Design a protein with these regions (language model features):
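Short catalytic/metal-binding and nucleic-acid-binding patches
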Residues: 1-207
Length: 207
C-alpha cells in the first residue's frame, strides 16, 4: 500500500497472515489509499513541496479509519489463525526481537491469531519495509519448519501509519495493550509486549 516515510520517526504497522483477509478487501483499501496519496501529493506540489496542515491531517485521519476497518475484519478470525498456537507466536517473537537495538527500536507489539500490530522506530538507514520483510521471512521459515509446509505464510502488503505526536503515540500504545481484550481473546490466544520504558511510565502514571 502507499506509505509515507520520515527518518527517525515511529510507525504503527500491521501485517497479517495470507488467509486472514479477502482479496477484494485488500484491493479496495489499496485503491482508496492510492487515491488519497495522489490527493496529498498534488496538494504538496501546489504548496511548494509541503501539503497544507489540513490536508495532512485529513490524510492521517483517513489512515486511522482504514486501520479501524482493517481491525474489525481481522478480529473476525478468518483463516487458520496459526498464531493462536504458542509455538508459532514464539517464532514470531524471536524474529521481532532479533534486530532490536541495531535495526530498530521495538516499542510495543500485539500478536493476534491472524495478524500482528507493531510500534517501532527504524534506526539508521533501515526502513520499515526491510524490517517487515525480515520479520516475516524469519518467522515463516521457523513456522513452516514446524508444520512441514512451504509457500507463502504472510500477506506481502502491510498497513502502517506515521506516529504524528505524543498523543497519537499514547493512543497506539493503549490500543496495542488492550487489543486482545477488545477482541475477546483468552490470554493463551495472543501475546502483548511493551518496552520496559513504557511499562515504567504506565506504573508511574496517576490512576
Amino acid at each position: 500500500l502507499p506509505h509515507w516515510r520520515m527518518p527517525g520517526r515511529c510507525y504503527f504497522t500491521t501485517f497479517r497472515l495470507r488467509d486472514s483477509l479477502p482479496a477484494e478487501v485488500v484491493e479496495e483499501m489499496k485503491a482508496e489509499a492510492l487515491a488519497w496519496q495522489k490527493r496529498v501529493a498534488e496538494a504538496a506540489r501546489v504548496h511548494a513541496g509541503k501539503p497544507p496542515p489540513e490536508e495532512w491531517a485529513a490524510w492521517q485521519d483517513f489512515q486511522q479509519a482504514q486501520m479501524r476497518k482493517l481491525e474489525m475484519i481481522l478480529d473476525e478470525g478468518r483463516g487458520e489463525c496459526l498464531l493462536r498456537h504458542p509455538e508459532h507466536r514464539q517464532a514470531l517473537i524471536n524474529a521481532l526481537h532479533h534486530f532490536e537495538g541495531h535495526r530498530c527500536e521495538m516499542l510495543a507489539y500485539a500478536i493476534m491469531p491472524n495478524h500482528v500490530h507493531v510500534l517501532c522506530r527504524p534506526l539508521g538507514e533501515h526502513s520499515l519495509e526491510s524490517l517487515n520483510r525480515s520479520w516475516k521471512r524469519h518467522s515463516a521459515d521457523r513456522i513452516h519448519r514446524r508444520l512441514g509446509h512451504s509457500g507463502s505464510l504472510w500477506q506481502e502488503e502491510s498497513f502502517d501509519c506515521l506516529i504524528r505526536d505524543a498523543d497519537h503515540y499514547g493512543r497506539v500504545v493503549r490500543y496495542i495493550a488492550k487489543n486482545p481484550i477488545s477482541a475477546h481473546l483468552q490470554p493463551a490466544e495472543a501475546a502483548v509486549w511493551l518496552h520496559p520504558r513504557i511499562m515504567e511510565a504506565n506504573r508511574a502514571a496517576p490512576s
